[in-house]
Amino acid sequence: MRRFSNICVILFSFLYATGHGASEEVMACLRQERSRVENPSQTIVNVVAENPAYLHCSVPPDAEHEIAWTRVSDGALLTAGNRTFTRDPRWQVSKKSANIWVLNLRRAEQQDSGCYLCEINDKHNTVYAVYLKVLEPPLPSPSSLQKKSTKLMANMSGDEVVLNCTVTSTDKDEEVLDVVWTRDGNTINFNDTEKYILKVKRDAGVVIETMRIRKATMEDDGNYACEHSQQKASQIVHINKAEAQTSNSATFPCSIFSISIFMYFLYL
């Protein structure tokens, strides 16, 4: 009876906030909740595509309980404790406080909409359900496109490829959202710290992200891009290995790299 009451409270809050009936998909998600107490966190999260999403899960205070986040649509285990198990680098988990865990989605896409479960390893096997709704972004106006620019520059530093992505907005009060890096259209996994290093600098209206590709070889060839909102700056990186000789009478073969770069700017 308590569980039914909790679901009714959740659905009433959703109806009040949205002004219309909850879909069967949302109701089916919330019915998967198993808890002796009402979920203190937000159970329905609405976010516009290309923005970050945060799903909260509260555990009993003064208790050492780990949690696991799963995606209902495919049963995928996303995180357990502070470890991430998905290969999608957009997903991360963090601990906001002693009893609040947050599933972070760096850049939400419409296909991320659906039901997510927070499972707590307490004696009651508590399960909290959170429904994520990713809304279609509004079409950008021509004036807003003119206010933003995205540039990507590349160079070599030793055996590393260094790519600098600069996002500039003429509106100093506008928050510059996360930049997404891709290679040949696939999101780059920055959890692979042996291969990639990412540093971010932020200032009023400007974000500079620097990506280093460590120990670059021809296998790292590709079309690298940094994307922000409706704009993308892209560079084709091609690494050639050559033989160099010293000017002395004795020669010592060594490997050097040269980089061929082609840059173009796209409006999506």
UniProtKB/Swiss-Prot annotation:
The keyword rRNA processing does not apply. It is found in: Secreted. Keywords: Disulfide bond, Glycoprotein, Immunoglobulin domain, Repeat, Secreted, Signal. GO terms for biological process: synapse organization. InterPro entries: Ig-like_dom (IPR007110), Ig-like_dom_sf (IPR036179), Ig-like_fold (IPR013783), Ig_sub (IPR003599), Ig_sub2 (IPR003598), Ig_V-set (IPR013106), Immunoglobulin_dom (IPR013151), Zig-8 (IPR037448). Pfam families: ig, V-set. Residues 40-128, 140-251 form the Ig-like C2-type domain. GO terms for cellular component: extracellular region; neuron projection membrane. Expressed in PVT neurons and pharyngeal muscles. PROSITE patterns: IG_LIKE (PS50835). Residues 1-21 form the signal peptide. Disruption phenotype: No visible phenotype. In a zig-5 mutant background, 74 percent of animals have cell bodies of ASI and ASH head neurons displaced either on the top of or anterior to the nerve ring. In addition, double mutants show defects in the positioning of the ventral nerve cord (VNC) axons characterized by axons of embryonically generated PVQ, PVP and HSN neurons from the left and right VNC drifting into the opposite cord (axon flip-over). Both defects begin at the L3 larval stage and become more pronounced at the L4 larval and adult stages. Its main location: secreted. Glycans are attached at residues 82, 155, 164, 191. Disulfide bonds join 57-118, 165-226. Together with zig-5, required postembryonically to maintain the position of ASI and ASH head neuron cell bodies and ventral nerve cord axons of PVQ, PVP and HSN neurons by preventing their displacement that could occur during body growth and movement. May act by reducing L1CAM-like protein sax-7 (long isoform) adhesion. This is Zwei Ig domain protein zig-8. It comes from Caenorhabditis elegans.
